[in-house]
Amino acid sequence: MADLGCGTGELTLMLTQAGYDMIGIDQSEEMLCVVRDKAEQLGLSGRLLLLRQDLLKLDLYGTIRAAVSTFDTFNHIPDLDTAIANAGFFMEKGGVFLFDMNTPYKHQNVLGENEFTFEEEDASCVWRNHYNAADRKVEITVDIDYHETGEHFHEEFCEYTYDLDTIRATLKKHGFALESVCDGETFGP
């Protein structure tokens, strides 16, 4: 099973512990280093494969029976068609692809032009959003200040908006059947 855009590997490692043969894929070497460290601490180093790859240039050197992709990974990809095509190319017939995405509603109405501030004992975070309707994307800026060390973290990234009809058509085009769509809060239809 492949974890496409595995980030820090939380799901990858949980699935490895559950007995799945896992491939964690991320384009960030920093994220993969975190996964390696966690895997070593858990005694899982030899039980998973980590690959540094861009999902738009995915090459697995073989097939997989399942793939997962969480934390809105596919919203971060500007070319949904190529990313889905790549996942489909390496998927065995009858394979399963489980993923989550933010909806146009969330991008336009929840994130939109809003700013969120989070204050914790050890850090504060300011999350700013700008919805670009013409390009159908949210431009996001995150600033985190760590109180004890005085360190400052700044990141800018985009999430692209894909409507359900586009997602459904893209999946079908690349050999997938959309079995169900669930609400991210209730997990209902």
What are these regions (language model features)?
Residues L98-T170:
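SAM-dependent methyltransferase
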